A protein has these predicted regions:
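Short, basic (Lys/Arg/His-rich) helix/loop patches that form interaction surfaces
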Residues: 66-75, 170-231, 235
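Conserved tyrosine-mediated DNA breakage-rejoining catalytic core shared by Y-recombinases
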Residues: 101-142, 237
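Active-site/catalytic core of tyrosine-dependent DNA strand-transfer enzymes
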Residues: 12, 56-57, 132-200
Length: 260
């Protein structure tokens, strides 16, 4: 991000020199060239965050965590993180900020309409999203429905803002990560032998749900074209480079052809 800001400042500075300087007439209003030796560095490659279908299934299979004695909450942070991770995945990568702020929807509707907080203010279409509630995710949508009707989900009744909500999710994801590592019965060597092309994640982040949705959608099993994934993620860059950052490429289908 800093790189792109500096590149923009350099571009504006160069445009200003072209506009206000006239070398033929000797009129140099902007003599400085602070960016003459500056080179824009290429950003480091973004680490793929997607989890494998196997890890996703393990998250689905996690049972409810025992609540502490005297707890007034009807779910623990681990349960919250599990359910919100699956909500995000099932709703095509909905961000935590949007889960928290999503407006109330028509009672008979099976499509969620909302504006992505991250990009709404920068887009002419206000980053409007239309996501169908599939039968597999409908029980979770119902579980967390806002009883007041103010918003779609009731998370705002438990967490006063995005920071406290994200904090609870991050703590819950850490406990999910610990639980998966404690119960996992397949080590890295066995994964390699089975043809897994991606190591187990160091730590599961909430954004991994969005990356996982994109990666699984583009996998050999589903074969959804990249442009459809690009639109579903609400990306607008014509070259789809942002979408490429989300998708962890798999070569498993090529290995299958080689061994076949």
């Amino acid at each position: 991000r800093d790189r792109s800001y500096l590149a923009c400042v350099r571009h504006i500075h160069n445009l200003a020199k072209q506009e206000f300087n006239d070398e033929e007439l000797g009129v140099i209003r902007i003599p400085q060239s602070p960016f003459k030796t500056y080179k824009v560095k290429q950003p480091p490659k973004v680490k793929k965050r997607a989890v494998s279908p196997d890890i996703l299934q393990q998250i689905i299979n996690l049972g409810d965590e025992p609540r502490r004695a005297g707890s007034i909450s009807d779910f623990t942070r681990r349960d919250l993180a599990r359910d919100c991770f699956l909500l995000s995945f099932g709703l095509a990568g909905m961000n935590a900020a949007d889960l928290l702020s999503c407006p109330a929807q028509p009672l008979d509707g099976d499509v969620i309409v909302y504006n992505r907080q991250k990009t709404a203010s920068r887009r002419e279409d206000e980053a409007e999203m239309h996501i169908r509630i599939e039968p597999q995710i409908a029980p979770l949508v119902e579980k967390f429905k806002d009883p007041t009707g103010a918003r779609l989900f009731r998370f705002h009744l438990h967490y006063r803002d995005g920071n406290t909500f994200n904090g609870a999710l991050n703590q819950g994801l850490k406990r999910i990560d610990d639980a998966l590592r404690a119960t996992r019965d397949v080590d890295q060597h066995q994964n390699d032998a089975a043809g897994e092309d991606r190591p187990l994640p160091e730590h599961i982040t909430f954004y991994a749900a969005r990356h996982s949705w994109a990666t699984i959608a583009r996998s050999a099993a589903l074969k959804i074209d990249k442009y459809t994934v690009h639109e579903a993620l609400n990306h607008v860059d014509a070259d789809m480079k942002i979408t490429d950052r989300y998708i962890a490429v798999s070569y498993t289908h090529l290995r299958a052809h080689e061994t076949g």
